Each structure stands twice: as structure tokens, then as C-alpha cells.
Swiss-Prot record:
Gene Ontology cellular-component terms listed: cytoplasm
Keyword Lyase attached: no
Residues annotated for Mn(2+) 2 binding in this entry: 196, 201, 219, 280
NCBIfam families documented for this protein: PRK05015.1
InterPro entries given in the database record: Leucine_aapep/pepB (IPR011356), M17_PepB-like_N (IPR047620), Pept_M17_PepB (IPR008330), Peptidase_M17_C (IPR000819)
Subunit note: Homohexamer.
HAMAP family hit by this protein: Aminopeptidase_M17
PROSITE patterns in alphabetical order: CYTOSOL_AP (PS00631)
Main location: cytoplasm
Subcellular compartments: Cytoplasm
CDD domains xrefs: Peptidase_M17 (cd00433)
Protein name: Peptidase B
A GO term for molecular function: metalloaminopeptidase activity
Amino acid sequence: MTKQIMPITLSYEPAAACWGEKALISSSEQGVMVHLVGKGKLGAVQRAGRKIDGQGIRHVALVGEGWDLEKSWAFWQGFRAPKGNRSIEWPQLPAAEKQELESRIKIIDWVRDTINMSAEELGPEQLAKRAIDLMCGMACESVSYRIIKGEDLREQGYTGIHTVGRGSSRDPILLALDYNPTGNPQAPVFACLVGKGVTFDTGGYSLKQSSFMDSMKSDMGGAATLTGALALAISRGLKQRVKLFLCIADNMVSGNAFKLGDVIHYRNGKSVEVMNTDAEGRLVLADGLIDASKEKAKLIIDAATLTGAAKTAVGNDYHSVLSFDDKLADDLLTAAASENELFWRLPLAEFHRSQLPSNFADLNNVAASPHTAGASTAAAFLSHFVEEYQKGWIHIDCSATYRKSAVEHWSAGATGYGVRSIANLLLAKAK
């Protein structure tokens, strides 16, 4: 059976009146036309891609004038979906733009595919392997790594990852990946990336309701996003040494799972009382941040699907940014704007660091009433594990990583959002 390919063209004129006053697309024997009138043209192209896919059209060609890199990418973002096969015949682009488009497709599609995998398919070991495979596919000669898993984590002092992950039949893992293109094993580490990789989150004994648990295969979105960001930065020419720490575990209920009231003792001397096992992401990230701080890198970025509070604040369209470093926060917002991604800064102040009191440890893993700024106190908790937290450290609460249902510009599932912005920031800081 011959594959039917639908031509897609762009127009800057409104559709004919018969299509409706606000019609985004119209069709004829020549194919489908996308009508770009008013502001927000990239968003309109992405919505058109989603609408065309919704009509069951799976094979298209972007033809005619106006299809530059960003419009082509916007169309793919909307057109792509987790089920079924799709193909696009791309427009002719300059060589550099073609290479960038191919890199985005390879890497950000990897991020989306990885996050969309079921928890049965993607456990801690599988996530670590996928990250290694992607990075080796980008620059294998410059990549080395070590994996610490299971009881070795406890013996080597990675108490947060071990505590959260010990309740699962699948061993928790720390993946420490070193991208060093300099050829010098003594080269300084320019940046450290620390990602939350909870491959399924039941909430532990602070058990989630089904309506909150059903998307928790995506709770490793921070780890996937940072892996993709490093890969994209490499494809764009990053030549500085970067270390990636993925803190990977299942948060399950079992006779061996951690419990409310347990106290975790970390390598940096901090002790943490667990008063909510569903605030587990910060417990695993703490181990990665301790390692990152030891590297004395000038830039530390952590990313995690950390709090519902951030999503309540900014919705599903923005990632949240929290940092004590105003310049660094501004730099990330600038990077995001240049990559056509939406980030929003949430407050983080010194007083948030004291809103985690415990009667039995240095810190509580959740803030006590009346301290209700959940995203801010979660970031404040993390700051206790960053040596120089006031400068060079930024926390991204990944509110836009995953959608439980389709909207007008995204299919259901992972978005790959944030990969471009973080890659942009890495390159800007590496200059």
C-alpha cells in the first residue's frame, strides 16, 4: 500500500470565511494550509501539528516558504505522540540548522520516549543504561562512568538513595557520568548536573491516591531532562568537563521500606527526620548534591519533578526556577527565552532554610505548618547539601515535564521541555 503524504504549507492570511473566523488550518486538493495570523506564530504551528495529528494524518511534508528551523521544530513538537508511527519530509534548511534539528529530534525524542516508558520497562538499572547509551552515542571517547547500586550505596554513604530505594525489589543506583572532552584527567569540572530519577513513586507509606500515582512513571523526568540537556550541549559544541549525577530509585511500599520517623544520616554531617515518605525526591538528590559540591564546579544545576506546590503555582506550561544566585537565575530565564521555552522564578530566601525544624534531627524532610511555601522549602532543604549554595547553584522544579492528557499543543505524555534551555545555559556559562 502506497504511503500517502500530506503537504503542509504556511500562510500569513486568514482562512476563507467558510472555515470559520478563527480557523487555524484549512485544506484543499493541494494539502493542508496553516494560517498564521496575529501573535504567537510558533505556538500556532505547534497547535496545528497537534490538530493535524488528531485528524489521523500520520505522514506529512513541510513544503513552500516559511518553514525555518523553529517552525519545523514547533510542528514536530505538536505532531509527535506516544502511539503510532509518524513521518515528516523536512524542508530544505541551511546545514547548521539541519544539524540542530536532527540533534533535537534524536535527543529530545529520547527524553520523551524515556519518560513515557512504563515503570515495568524502566527501572533504575534500565534508566542508567539508557543514559549511558545516549551519552556514548554522542561522545563515547570522552565519557566514563561509575555505577553504585544496592547495598554498596549504604556502605559508601549514599544513605538517601539507599533509604528511598531499599523497599523495592529493584536495586537503587547512583550513576556518576563524567564528560571530559579535554583529554586531561585532572581538568577542572566546569559544571555538575544532578537529576532525580525516581522510576516509580508510590509515595511510600505516605501513600498516593491512584489519581496522583497514575503518572508517577514520569517521576524520573529530572534525570532524563538533564541527560538530554548535556547531550544537546555536546551536539552544539560543549568542550568543558561536566559531571552528571543521576540519583535513581523506586519509592515502594514493603516490609523493608523506610518509615515515618526514620532518621537519615548524610555524609556531609546533616541528619534528616522523615515525616513524609512522599517527599523522597529531595532525599535522593541530597546524595548527588553532596558529590557535586565536592567537585568545586562553578555551576551546579539540579532538576526534579519535586513538588506539587510548584505545579500549583505555575501550572503545566512552565518549569519553576529557584536560586539564591540572582544572576544565575536571570541567565537561565534569558536562555529559556532564546529557546522559546517558559520558565518562571519562584521565591527562595534564607528564612526558608529554617522552616524545616525537627525534634530528632538537624532537618525535617518537609516543612511544618504554618510554613506552606512547598516549592521554596523543598529547594531550601536541598540547599543544606550544597556547600556554596548562595552562588552558582540553581534548582529546577520540573512542572512541565509530563502531561496526563492531551491539550491543544501537546499530546499526552512527556514534553522534553527544558532540555534546550539547560543546554543553552551550559554553553553560555562555558564561554
